[in-house]
Amino acid sequence: MTEPGSYKETVNLPQTAFDMRANAVKREPELQKFWAENQIYENLSQENPGDPFILHDGPPYANGDLHIGHALNKILKDIINKYWMLQGRKVRYVPGWDCHGLPIELKVLQGMKSEQRAALTPLSLRQAAKEFALQTVERQKQSFKRYGVWGEWDNPYLTLKPEYEAAQIGVFGQMVLKGYIYRGLKPVYWSPSSQTALAEAELEYPEGHTSRSIYVSFALTSLSATAEAVLKDYLPNLKVAIWTTTPWTIPGNLAVALNPDLTYAVVEKDGSYLLVANELVERLETTLGVSLPIKTTIAGQALEHSTYQHPLFDRQGPLVMGDYVTTDSGTGLVHTAPGHGQEDYVVGQHYGLPILSPVDGNGRFTEEAGQFAGLKVLDEGNEAVIQALQQVGALLKEEAYSHKYPYDWRTKKPVILRATEQWFASVEGFREAALQAIAQVQWIPAQGENRITAMVSERSDWCISRQRNWGVPIPVFYDEETGEPLLNAETIAHVQAIVAEKGSDAWWELSIEELLPQAYRNNGRRYRKGTDTMDVWFDSGSSWAAVLEQREQLRYPAEMYLEGSDQHRGWFQSSLLTSVATHGIAPYKTVLTHGFVLDEQGRKMSKSLGNVVDPAIVIEGGKNQKEDPPYGADILRLWVSSVDYSSDVPLGKNILKQMADIYRKIRNTARFLLGNLHDFDPANNKVEYDRLPQLDRYMLHRIVEVFTEVNEAFTSYQFFRFFQTVQNFCVVDLSNFYLDIAKDRLYISAPDDFRRRSCQTVLWIALENLAKAIAPVVPHLAEDIWQFLPYPTPYKSVFEAGWVSLDATWTNPDPQLLETFEQVRLLRFKVNECLEKLRVNKVIGASLEAKVLLYIADPEKRQQWQNLNPPALAAISGVDELRYFFLTSQVELLNSPDQLSELKSEYRFEFGDSSGGVLPADGQKCDRCWNYSTYVGKDDKHLLLCERCVAVMER
C-alpha cells in the first residue's frame, strides 16, 4: 500500500452508540421509565444489606407551583439518599405534603364569587380546600419526579389523611395528659387581615417598615417609700417619659416598666420635671431639641410601686421592674400593656395586673377603648391616639421610626399583638429537655445549633389554636353553662378513633353526642364543641409520630431532617417541641440546612426584577428555546452539587450555561471511554495490576485519590467538593493528560496488543467508577453510561452495581513513580507552551511534527529520564516513553545545555536546574500513526509506515 490514506481502516477508532448530546427532554423520561419498570428504588430500598437510612421529608406546602427553592431542597435530599443507597443502605424516602391552613383557605376563597362565598359552610369550605390541596399535590409530585427524585410516590404522607390527623391528635393528647396544654388569655400575634392568631413561624419582617413613634409623659401621683426621700420636692410636677412605636396600645396601658439596675435622672423641662434614664439625657436633648438640666438621680429599684395617672383614662398604674428594659433607644422607661406584648404580659402577671386588650379580631378598638371605639388601630386609631395625647399636653414628640415589624406571611399585611383566649403548649414545661435534646443532634452547618438554641431559650409558649375551618380540630368541648373545657384521656381517645376512621371532617359532620364518649352523653350537662383548629406547624411538627412511628421500615428518630435555614424557627422547632414533650428526645439525629436561592447578583428573586428561575423552564425549556434552552434535570442537579448550600446560593442564565459546559465535558469524557472499550471485556481482556506499565499504575493511584475525595465529599455532605473533584478528574487527569497520551496506544496498536489492553483496563476502571460516583448527582447521565457499557455486566442498573470499588493495591505505589509523573506533568506543561509558539509561528502544525530536547543536570535524575527514553526500535510496545507523554515524535536527552543554544529563546524552557527546547522532528510522517520517523520509506512493503506500524501490519 503506497497511497496516502490507505491505512485508515487499520486504525482502532472509538465505536459507541452513546450519544454526544444528552437530549435530556427525551432521554431522561426514558431512563425514569426504565427505573420504574424495573423497580430499582423499590428493590434496593428493601434488599440492600446495610442499615436503614431514613431522611424524613419536611412537607412542602400544597399551594401553587414549585419554585427553585423546592428544587434545591428535594435534589439535595435525593443526592444524599442515592449516595447511601449506593453504599448498600436501606433507604426509604416518604415524601410528604402540608395540606391544611390559612393559605390554602385563602386561595380557595379568592377563586370564588361573592355569592359562592356567602353560601359556604365550614364543611363545603373544607371540601373545596381539600380538592385544591390534592390537585396541587398531584402537580407538585409530577415535577419532583421529573427532577429524578426517588421515593414512595404512590404512598406519600399527606397531613389531611385520616391516619395522619389521628396520630396528630394523639400527640396533642399526650401533651394534654402531661400537663403541657393550657387555655389562657394571652397576647398573641394576631393578623387583622386573616382574622386569626399566628405562630412566630408565620411572620415575616420585610425591609422598609416605618412606624409612628411617640415620646409621651405620664404624671406621677404617688411615690414609693424608697423614692419619697429623693423625689418628694418634685411632685406634683414630676412625670415619667415613655417612648413607643405603637401609639394605638396607649389605651391598653396599665403600667410603666423600669430597669432596677439603671440610674434614672430627674431633668427639668418647661417648668416641670421628667424622669428618664440618666445615660439617655444627652440623646433626649438632641431628640426633643431642648436642654434638659439634671436635678437629681435615683436608682431604678427605688421607684418600684410608685404610681402615675393615665393621660387619657381615669385610672392609675404602677411603676414596675423589668430587666428587659434597656437604653438602646427611647427613654429607659417602657409603656406596659399586658394585653399587647409578651414581656408586658409576663411582668403584668408578676404584678397581678389585669389583661386589657381593647381591640377586636378585625383590628378595631372595642368599647373598652372609649372615644376610640370602632377605629382601625393601625390606621385612624393611631392618629386619633396621637391627637388625643397632643390635646392633653402629654405628647412630647412624634417622629418616624424605621425598624423590623412583623407581617402576616400570606397577606403581607402588618400584624398586632392582642390578648385572646387561645390554646397554648407550655414550652416552659419542657424547655430544658428541649435544649438538652438539641445538644445531642449533629447540626450541619454547625452554627445551626446556636440558632435553634437561642430561639428555644427565648421563645414564649406556643399558641397552637387558630380561628379557621381548614385544619385539624382541637378536640375540646365546653360546658354550656360554665364555659369550662372538657379535655381528658377518654374524650381525646374517642375523638382520635373517630378521626382515624372518618377523617377530621367528622368534627363538623357528627353531633356532639356522637363525638362524646358514652360516659359524657346524657350526664345532665350540655356541651358545645370547640371551633378552633390546630396551628399548621403542629400538623407538620407531628410528622415523626404520623409517619416515622407508624410506617414499617421507617425509624424514629430519623437519621436526618434537611430543610432551608428558615426552618430553625419552623418545622425543626415544632418537630423538636412535640417530640421532646412526648418522648423526651429530638426526632432527628442530624439536621442539615441550606440557604435561599438568589440571582447572579445576589438579589432575591422576584417577578418585578424579572430574575426568577423556574425549574420547569430550566428542565423543559421556555417558549423561546434560544433564550431558555431545555437543559434537563441533570444540569439542575449538577448546579445543586456545585454550590456551598450552607449559605445563600446564586443561580441564573450564565451559571446554567457554565453547568451545561461542565456536564458536556463529563459526558464527552464518558463517551470517549465507552468508545474505546467497544472490543474490551474485563472478564477476558483485563491486565493484572503487577503487569501494568508505570503510567497506568500512576493513573490508578490518581483514581484512588480522586474517588476517595469524592467519597469524603458525600459522607461530609460537602457536595461542592464532589463537583470540583469530578470536573477536575475528567478535564485535567483524563482528557488533558491520560487520554491525550492514550490515543496513540488505543488507535495505533494491534487490537489485542498488551499496550492497548493495559490502557483499556484503566479506562474500564475509570468509567465504571465515574458512573457510580456521579450517580447520586446526575443519575440520568450515570444510568445512560451504564446502559451503553459494551461488555456484559451482572447489574442492569448503575444503582444495583453499588458504590465505587477501589483496590487497596492501587493506593501505595512506589513514591519514585509518583514523583516521576508529577515531574512529567510539569514538564508537559512547559513543552506545550513551546509547542504552541512553534504552531503560532507556523513552524509545525500538530505536536507530532516536533522533537523535544532535554538537558537534565542531575546525573541520577538523568538516568531515570533515560529509562523513559529508549531508542526508537527498542520499544515497539512501549508505553512509558517521554515521546508519548509529550505527544511528540522524538525526545533527545542532551549531554550538555550548550546544544540548546542554537534554538531561538522562545523555543527554549527552564525547569529547576534543567532546561529544554523544541524543534521540528526528524524523518518523515508515518501515514498510519502520524508520528515522524527516519524509518519511513525504508520498508519495501510499507513505504509510508514507521517501524512501529510496520510491526503491527506484519502480525
Curated annotation (Swiss-Prot):
<dbReference type="InterPro" id="IPR050081">
    <property type="entry name" value="Ile-tRNA_ligase"/>
</dbReference>
<dbReference type="GO" id="GO:0002161">
    <property type="term" value="F:aminoacyl-tRNA deacylase activity"/>
</dbReference>
<dbReference type="Pfam" id="PF06827">
    <property type="entry name" value="zf-FPG_IleRS"/>
</dbReference>
<dbReference type="InterPro" id="IPR013155">
    <property type="entry name" value="M/V/L/I-tRNA-synth_anticd-bd"/>
</dbReference>
<feature type="binding site">
    <location>
        <position position="946"/>
    </location>
    <ligand>
        <name>Zn(2+)</name>
    </ligand>
</feature>
<comment type="function">
    <text>Catalyzes the attachment of isoleucine to tRNA(Ile). As IleRS can inadvertently accommodate and process structurally similar amino acids such as valine, to avoid such errors it has two additional distinct tRNA(Ile)-dependent editing activities. One activity is designated as 'pretransfer' editing and involves the hydrolysis of activated Val-AMP. The other activity is designated 'posttransfer' editing and involves deacylation of mischarged Val-tRNA(Ile).</text>
</comment>
<dbReference type="Pfam" id="PF08264">
    <property type="entry name" value="Anticodon_1"/>
</dbReference>
<dbReference type="InterPro" id="IPR002301">
    <property type="entry name" value="Ile-tRNA-ligase"/>
</dbReference>
<dbReference type="Pfam" id="PF00133">
    <property type="entry name" value="tRNA-synt_1"/>
</dbReference>
<dbReference type="InterPro" id="IPR001412">
    <property type="entry name" value="aa-tRNA-synth_I_CS"/>
</dbReference>
<feature type="binding site">
    <location>
        <position position="563"/>
    </location>
    <ligand>
        <name>L-isoleucyl-5'-AMP</name>
    </ligand>
</feature>
<keyword id="KW-0547">Nucleotide-binding</keyword>
<keyword id="KW-0862">Zinc</keyword>
<dbReference type="GO" id="GO:0006428">
    <property type="term" value="P:isoleucyl-tRNA aminoacylation"/>
</dbReference>
<keyword id="KW-0436">Ligase</keyword>
<dbReference type="InterPro" id="IPR033708">
    <property type="entry name" value="Anticodon_Ile_BEm"/>
</dbReference>
<dbReference type="GO" id="GO:0000049">
    <property type="term" value="F:tRNA binding"/>
</dbReference>
<comment type="subunit">
    <text>Monomer.</text>
</comment>
<keyword id="KW-0648">Protein biosynthesis</keyword>
<dbReference type="InterPro" id="IPR014729">
    <property type="entry name" value="Rossmann-like_a/b/a_fold"/>
</dbReference>
<dbReference type="InterPro" id="IPR002300">
    <property type="entry name" value="aa-tRNA-synth_Ia"/>
</dbReference>
<feature type="binding site">
    <location>
        <position position="607"/>
    </location>
    <ligand>
        <name>ATP</name>
    </ligand>
</feature>
<feature type="short sequence motif" description="'HIGH' region">
    <location>
        <begin position="60"/>
        <end position="70"/>
    </location>
</feature>
<dbReference type="InterPro" id="IPR009008">
    <property type="entry name" value="Val/Leu/Ile-tRNA-synth_edit"/>
</dbReference>
<keyword id="KW-0963">Cytoplasm</keyword>
<keyword id="KW-0479">Metal-binding</keyword>
<dbReference type="InterPro" id="IPR010663">
    <property type="entry name" value="Znf_FPG/IleRS"/>
</dbReference>
<dbReference type="GO" id="GO:0008270">
    <property type="term" value="F:zinc ion binding"/>
</dbReference>
<keyword id="KW-0030">Aminoacyl-tRNA synthetase</keyword>
<protein>
    <recommendedName>
        <fullName>Isoleucine--tRNA ligase</fullName>
        <ecNumber>6.1.1.5</ecNumber>
    </recommendedName>
</protein>
<keyword id="KW-0067">ATP-binding</keyword>
<comment type="similarity">
    <text>Belongs to the class-I aminoacyl-tRNA synthetase family. IleS type 1 subfamily.</text>
</comment>
<feature type="binding site">
    <location>
        <position position="949"/>
    </location>
    <ligand>
        <name>Zn(2+)</name>
    </ligand>
</feature>
<feature type="binding site">
    <location>
        <position position="929"/>
    </location>
    <ligand>
        <name>Zn(2+)</name>
    </ligand>
</feature>
<dbReference type="InterPro" id="IPR009080">
    <property type="entry name" value="tRNAsynth_Ia_anticodon-bd"/>
</dbReference>
<feature type="binding site">
    <location>
        <position position="926"/>
    </location>
    <ligand>
        <name>Zn(2+)</name>
    </ligand>
</feature>
<dbReference type="GO" id="GO:0004822">
    <property type="term" value="F:isoleucine-tRNA ligase activity"/>
</dbReference>
<dbReference type="InterPro" id="IPR023585">
    <property type="entry name" value="Ile-tRNA-ligase_type1"/>
</dbReference>
<dbReference type="GO" id="GO:0005737">
    <property type="term" value="C:cytoplasm"/>
</dbReference>
<feature type="short sequence motif" description="'KMSKS' region">
    <location>
        <begin position="604"/>
        <end position="608"/>
    </location>
</feature>
<dbReference type="GO" id="GO:0005524">
    <property type="term" value="F:ATP binding"/>
</dbReference>
